[in-house]
């Protein structure tokens, strides 16, 4: 299954706010109207929608998300918590959380077009897993810095999660530590996602 490239508002109307996909928000009451039209949701549909929320927010294909679930299952600790940590520490998501890109798809473009350095080297893989003490910077070119400046100027200036530090005038971000679960950038019940996949495999 490919990455979603369709109308974004249609998705947030059904699934709720997906800040990684778009900074638009569903109108108040639209979710309630959808629920009343569709009646009571089955447990399967509830798990499916939670999985879709995760997939669309982080901009993943079905195959990519399944791969992350399998990695999380093999790791120590809660599978759901590990899954969220893996997704939050992706380079495209870190750029988004720093405000250096307005959405995760925009961050992915920055990385694919070689505008981003990690520890002084160009990284063109959006799924690159960032680690504590990584230094993320814009390439020292006017175009790269201009693209990031647009995002920094238009970002909502929300409180940065405590695992990140931003130096906006240097176009630089620091990864201080692995993300704490309370700073995850999406309202999600990750256990429902794990349950969805445990019933599929």
From Swiss-Prot:
Pfam families: Ribosomal_S4, S4. The keyword Metal-binding does not apply. It comes from the Eukaryota. It is found in: Plastid, Chloroplast. Keywords: Chloroplast, Plastid, Ribonucleoprotein, Ribosomal protein, RNA-binding, rRNA-binding. One of its GO terms (cellular component) is small ribosomal subunit. GO terms for molecular function: rRNA binding; structural constituent of ribosome. Residues 17-44 are annotated as: Disordered. SMART domains: Ribosomal_S4, S4. GO terms for biological process: ribosomal small subunit biogenesis; translation. InterPro entries: Ribosomal_uS4 (IPR022801), Ribosomal_uS4_bac-type (IPR005709), Ribosomal_uS4_CS (IPR018079), Ribosomal_uS4_N (IPR001912), S4_RNA-bd (IPR002942), S4_RNA-bd_sf (IPR036986). Its main location: plastid. Residues 89-149 form the S4 RNA-binding domain. The keyword Ribonucleoprotein applies. Part of the 30S ribosomal subunit. Contacts protein S5. The interaction surface between S4 and S5 is involved in control of translational fidelity. HAMAP family: Ribosomal_uS4_B (MF_01306_B). Belongs to the universal ribosomal protein uS4 family. One of the primary rRNA binding proteins, it binds directly to 16S rRNA where it nucleates assembly of the body of the 30S subunit. This is Small ribosomal subunit protein uS4c.
